[in-house]
């Protein structure tokens, strides 16, 4: 699938950090808050989120088993592309291992964000870099996109649906 069809462009680290800073994702206020990247790709945002979460948690506690539970409970992701999803899990595991944690059961799903409703209205932060795809390039996904308010009529981009979600 081409970039034009998938809208898949990975986010550079400096931009990830800037976006998280603008969203005020730092300090004690991030602990025990749900965050999702619903187009997580290879995990650029999730890796930085995990790094920030671990760093903040470890200023208060050395209980890595509890830290692991919190990472599994409060950090979420969705990625439709199976290769990017596997890369994401691998990248998250590398970050976790730098903090002395293994076998984290990440709440990252290889699924279509347009169809997942599990996380609706349950997040404290929604962050990421959604795909930029014109509706006429969506092929068979068009009927699902039309169900969303922003994409109800005329020409639009898929990224608007991700803002609505």
Task: Describe the role of every protein-language-model region.
Residues 1-165:
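SAM-dependent methyltransferase catalytic region
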């Amino acid at each position: 699938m081409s970039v034009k069809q998938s809208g898949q462009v990975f986010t550079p680290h400096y931009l990830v950090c800037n976006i998280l800073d603008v969203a005020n994702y730092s300090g004690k206020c991030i602990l025990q808050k749900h965050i999702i990247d619903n187009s997580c790709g290879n995990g650029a945002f999730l890796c930085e989120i995990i790094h920030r979460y671990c760093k903040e948690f470890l200023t208060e506690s050395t209980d890595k088993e509890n830290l692991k539970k919190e990472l599994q409970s409060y950090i979420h992701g969705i990625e439709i592309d199976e290769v990017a999803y596997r890369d994401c899990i691998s990248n998250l595991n590398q970050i976790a291992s730098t903090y002395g944690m293994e076998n984290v059961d990440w709440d990252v799903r290889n699924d279509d964000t347009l169809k997942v409703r599990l996380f609706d209205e349950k997040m404290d932060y929604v962050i990421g870099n959604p795909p930029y795809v014109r509706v006429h390039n969506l092929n068979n996904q068009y009927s699902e996109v039309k169900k969303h308010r922003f994409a109800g009529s005329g020409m639009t981009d898929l990224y608007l649906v991700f803002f609505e979600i």
